[in-house]
Curated annotation (Swiss-Prot):
It holds the Pfam family SAICAR_synt. This is Phosphoribosylaminoimidazole-succinocarboxamide synthase. GO terms for cellular component: cytosol. The lineage of its organism: Bacteria, Pseudomonadati, Pseudomonadota, Gammaproteobacteria, Enterobacterales. One of its GO terms (molecular function) is ATP binding. Coiled coil: none annotated. Its EC number is 6.3.2.6. CDD domains: SAICAR_synt_PurC (cd01415). Belongs to the SAICAR synthetase family. PANTHER family: MULTIFUNCTIONAL PROTEIN ADE2, SI:DKEY-6E2.2.
């Protein structure tokens, strides 16, 4: 399958059409952004690492019964996916307090959240992805009540699968975001799962192994991403 026209250019990925109206090609770039795209830098190998990381994770989720848009890996930084009608709301699961939750509520970073928190955010960079709830989704027609319930169920199921995967690799899955869409009317997991959209800490040292290394200018971003990939069994060569 060959890529045709550029359909959309995001902060770290470019989406291309193909000869089929049902499929797209995602190209993972080396760009890394923070502050809603106001700060952007490039890191060698990042596109390759995130592409293979995402492919690995999506396959794990498929094996667990979570439908994803993933079709097949095309190259080091490209993957073929189903074309979804994307829901304009992203789901966030929080197992420990970090990021915006700490700022918003003054909770100590690292506090265990039991049960895990499920948050919703409208995908709108210009408004800094405002937090919303189920009522907003229904009132504004962003997603039906039934499909939102399925998104929530799949988010928690993904959390169970991935928390165990990372725990066995000596890592804590602190939080992560998921994006869903519809394919032939069915809720399907789209976009990506990588250290760009999740928080991962080393279990012993609590070192941050995700994009917070870039946000907080800690250094060693790609080294951390590659270490996480190595621990969970992603082949990067």
């Amino acid at each position: 399958m060959q890529k045709k026209a550029e359909l959309y250019r995001g902060k770290a990925k470019t989406v291309y059409t193909t000869e089929s109206s049902d499929y797209l090609i995602l190209e993972f770039r080396n760009d890394t952004s923070a502050l809603d795209g106001q700060r952007i830098e490039q890191f060698d190998r990042k596109g390759m690492v995130n592409n293979k990381f995402n492919y690995f994770i999506m396959n794990k989720l498929e094996e667990a019964g979570i439908p994803t848009q993933m079709e097949r890996l095309l190259s080091d930084n490209e993957v073929l996916v189903k074309k979804l009608d994307m829901v304009p709301v992203e789901c966030v699961i929080r197992n420990r307090a970090a990021g915006s939750l700490v700022k918003r509520l003054g909770i100590e970073e690292g506090t265990v959240l039991n049960p895990p928190i499920f948050d919703l955010f409208l995908k709108d960079d210009a408004r800094h992805d405002p937090m919303v709830n189920e009522s907003y989704c229904e009132t504004f027609g962003w997603v039906s009540k039934e499909n939102l319930a399925e998104m929530k169920r799949l988010s928690y199921k993904a959390n169970d699968v991935l928390s165990e995967l990372f725990d066995k690799a000596g890592l804590i899955l602190v939080d992560f975001k998921l994006e869903f869409g519809l394919f032939n009317g069915k809720v399907v997991l789209g976009d990506e799962f990588s250290p760009d959209g999740s928080r991962l800490w080393d279990k012993n040292t609590l070192d941050k192994m995700d994009k917070d290394r870039f946000r907080q200018s800690l250094g060693g971003l790609i080294e951390a991403y590659e270490e996480v990939a190595r621990r969970i069994g992603v082949s990067l060569d």
